[in-house]
Amino acid sequence: MRVLGIETSCDETGIAIYDDQQGLLANQLYSQVKLHADYGGVVPELASRDHVRKTVPLIQAALKEAGLTAKDIDAVAYTAGPGLVGALLVGATVGRALAFAWNVPAIPVHHMEGHLLAPMLEDNPPAFPFVALLVSGGHTQLISVTGIGQYELLGESIDDAAGEAFDKTAKLLGLDYPGGPMLSKMASQGTEGRFVFPRPMTDRPGLDFSFSGLKTFAANTIRSNGDDEQTRADIARAFEDAVVDTLMIKCRRALEQTGFKRLVMAGGVSANRTLRAKLAEMMQKRGGEVFYARPEFCTDNGAMIAYAGMVRLQTGAKAELGVTVRPRWPLAELPAA
C-alpha cells in the first residue's frame, strides 16, 4: 500500500509517499520561514496563499522522486487539524480532489497523531504502551498511549506551549524568527548557574505545565542585567535549563503514575539536543527507553501524515467524502483502532 501524505497545518508544506513494504519513498518539504520572518511570526493569510502555490508542485516532485505515477497511489492522507483553518483547507481540498480523481480513499489525519507516530518511522520503533511527550510551538502535552487511538491526556500547558515560550523569549533576546533553535544555539555558549529560573508547577502535584511566567522572568532578568552577548547567552542557558528540567520532572511523574517503561518524545521541540540528552539520561537511570524521530521528522512534515494515514487505513478508517477541517481538535476525541 502506497499513501501520499499532505501536511499544510501551519507554515510548512510537506508532501511524502509511504509504502507499507518499502518504507518512505519520497519526502518533499518547503518551509515558509523566510516569508514570515519580517513579521516575527506566522501570518495566516500569507501561509494559506503560499500553500496554494507550493502544494501541487511538491506532489509532482514527490511522485518524481519515488519514480511513481498517480495510478501507483493507493490512498491520500491529509492533515485535517488542528492548525490554521485556511492552511488546513488548502491541503484538505487538494487531498480530497486528488483522491476523487484517482478513485482512492481520502484519509483525514490528526496533526498531533502524526507527530506522536513519527518515531515509528525509525528502525527501532516504540511498542505500546508508552508515555508520549508532545512538545511543539502549539502544544505541550503528556499522553498515555496504549494503542492507536487509545490516548489519555495526563497533563498539558495551561498557557503557553514550550515551543511558544522558546520563540517569545528568543524575541526578548533579540533573536530572529523562528527563535527557538537560535535560542538553543545561544544557550550552548551560556554559563550554567549564573542565572536560575523557576521550574513552574513542579512544586505541586499534577502533570500540567505553565511556561508563560518564564518569559516574564526572562524579561525582568534582561532588564536587570544588561544585554551584552555573554549575559544574553547566560540568560538563554538558564531559560532552556528551566524548560528542560520542568519537562523532565513531569515526564518522570507521568512514568511513575502509569508504570510504563517507555517514553516517546515528539513535536518540534523534541529536536532540542539538551532535552534529548536529559531524557535519555533519566530513562537510562530508570531502566527504561526513550524514543524520538530524527530531527527532520520532529518538525512538521508529510512523512508523518502519510504514515499515520496508512496506519489508520489499515486499522479500518473510512474515507471522508467531504472536506472538513478542525482548527481545534483534542487528540482524545480520535476513535480507537
From Swiss-Prot:
Keywords: Acyltransferase, Cytoplasm, Iron, Metal-binding, Transferase, tRNA processing. Binds 1 Fe(2+) ion per subunit. It catalyses: L-threonylcarbamoyladenylate + adenosine(37) in tRNA = N(6)-L-threonylcarbamoyladenosine(37) in tRNA + AMP + H(+). Substrate binds at residues 134-138, 167, 180, 272. GO terms for biological process: tRNA threonylcarbamoyladenosine modification. It is found in: Cytoplasm. Its main location: cytoplasm. Its EC number is 2.3.1.234. Its cofactor is Fe(2+). One of its GO terms (cellular component) is cytoplasm. NCBIfam families: gcp_kae1 (TIGR00329), T6A_TsaD_YgjD (TIGR03723). Belongs to the KAE1 / TsaD family. Required for the formation of a threonylcarbamoyl group on adenosine at position 37 (t(6)A37) in tRNAs that read codons beginning with adenine. Is involved in the transfer of the threonylcarbamoyl moiety of threonylcarbamoyl-AMP (TC-AMP) to the N6 group of A37, together with TsaE and TsaB. TsaD likely plays a direct catalytic role in this reaction. This is tRNA N6-adenosine threonylcarbamoyltransferase.
